[in-house]
A protein has these predicted regions:
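Long, small/polar-residue-biased beta-strand-and-loop interaction regions
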Residues: 1-116, 144-148, 156, 187-196, ...
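Short, conserved beta-turn/loop elements at beta-strand boundaries and strand-helix junctions
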Residues: 67-68, 82, 166-174, 245, ...
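Autoprocessing Asn-cyclization modules and mimics
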Residues: 97-188, 196-236
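Polar low-complexity, Ser/Thr/Gly/Ala/Asp/Asn-rich disordered segments used for subunit assembly
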Residues: 109-119, 192-304
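Short, flexible surface segments
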Residues: 52, 138-141, 293
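Short alpha-helix capping/helix-loop boundary micro-motifs
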Residues: 42, 49, 122-135, 178, ...
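Membrane engagement elements in two modes
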Residues: 1-24, 142-145, 164, 170, ...
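Intrinsic-disorder/low-complexity, polar/charged segments enriched in Ser/Thr/Lys/Arg/Asp/Glu/Gln
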Residues: 55-59, 121-125, 173, 237, ...
Length: 335
């Protein structure tokens, strides 16, 4: 079955701090960030911050919260609206566990079309949200960009995706050279241009199984034997330790020991209490040979989620606004 829109959820990270980078970000929690709710991600901007300027980071996860272990394919992530206030937001892809001081990715951003563009054009001039874009460089050579005068959720207007072959910055003015001519004409008043992060597939992942046993075996080559479930998988390093020929304990580096043991005589599917669904499954058919006390299997799981860092910059002297917002859009396919 395909992944449904309502099965794609934004979730917060476990840690939030504006003073200790090592305490900001981290792993995904299973709370939900509801779109349109005040302070769902960032706190209010104080008068002191508006006067002096400020930068804050917040981490979120876009979780494929589907009971079907189907991958979200041809994933595209982009900012689809300008902030109405004087601040601006870019996003940077993260890792399942990184905190603010470990952010290593590059930013992605958005701009408004500055000059009308005709069908067949191979160059765009856009106005970025701030001259700081010249330092951050959220548009880069080789990027896929979205050019559109319609909402990301659909409706009237046009949308197209094109690669850029060169970028130049002059303050907030950004010139983009296109690898292929545009198929449509666009007007400055209604057209936004976004740099796009891409991934071929997003799904739970079961990786790096290592079995330590002299006479036991694990079939890692048969599809479906080892599953990290979209709904319940977390970022974890797991160790299964055999108690005897059939039963084993299950522990994770972050979770510690799970209360219920597993057995090679049945599928092992320990339940994530936050989602009431399994973290992972090891099929009984994947085991063979003879095990003994002390044998171990270690492996890693990764959640079916995109870790995203939002960076909000409030330039010095910014005006106040009661209903500020930033909008990140996701496009993908499933079968």
């Amino acid at each position: 079955m395909p992944i449904l829109d309502n099965e794609i959820l934004w979730r917060p990270a476990a840690l939030q701090s504006d003073t200790l980078p090592a305490q900001n970000g981290g792993r995904m929690t299973f709370s939900q960030l509801v779109s349109g709710v005040k302070n769902n991600l960032f706190p209010d901007v104080s008068q002191a911050e508006r006067l002096a300027g400020a930068v804050k980071w917040r981490k979120a996860f876009i979780h494929i919260n589907s009971a079907q272990d189907t991958a979200l394919l041809n994933v595209r992530l982009f900012i689809d609206a300008l902030t109405p206030a004087g601040d601006f937001v870019t996003f940077t892809p993260g890792t399942p566990t990184d905190t603010e001081q470990n952010i290593a990715g590059r930013p992605y951003g958005i701009g408004a079309l500055q000059l009308a563009s005709s069908s067949g054009a191979t160059q765009l001039l856009i106005t970025a949200e701030h001259a700081e874009y010249a330092t951050l460089t959220p548009f880069r050579t080789g990027d896929l960009i979205r050019v559109s005068d319609r909402p990301s959720t659909g409706g009237s207007g046009n949308e197209e995706w094109v690669l850029i072959t060169a970028v130049s910055y002059e303050g907030a003015n950004v010139t983009l050279e296109l690898a292929a001519p545009l198929s449509n004409a666009y007007a400055p008043a209604t057209t936004l241009v976004s740099s796009v992060w891409q991934s071929a597939a997003i799904a739970g992942r079961f990786t790096n199984p290592v079995l330590t046993s002299s006479t036991g075996q694990l079939d890692t080559g048969t599809q479906g034997n080892l599953i990290a479930h979209n709904k319940g998988a977390i970022a974890e390093h797991w160790t299964l330790t055999f108690l005897d020929a059939t039963s084993f304990t299950i522990s994770g580096v972050s979770l510690g020991s799970l209360p219920a043991p597993g057995s090679i005589t049945a599928d092992s599917s320990p339940i994530n209490p936050a989602t009431n669904s399994p973290y992972f499954t090891i099929k009984a058919a994947s085991w063979s040979g003879v095990f003994q006390a002390g044998d171990q299997l270690s492996f890693e799981t990764t959640p079916a989620a995109i870790p995203v860092w939002y960076r909000r910059q409030v330039p010095a002297g910014t005006f106040s606004l009661a209903n500020d917002l930033a909008s990140l859009a996701l496009h993908g396919e499933s079968a």
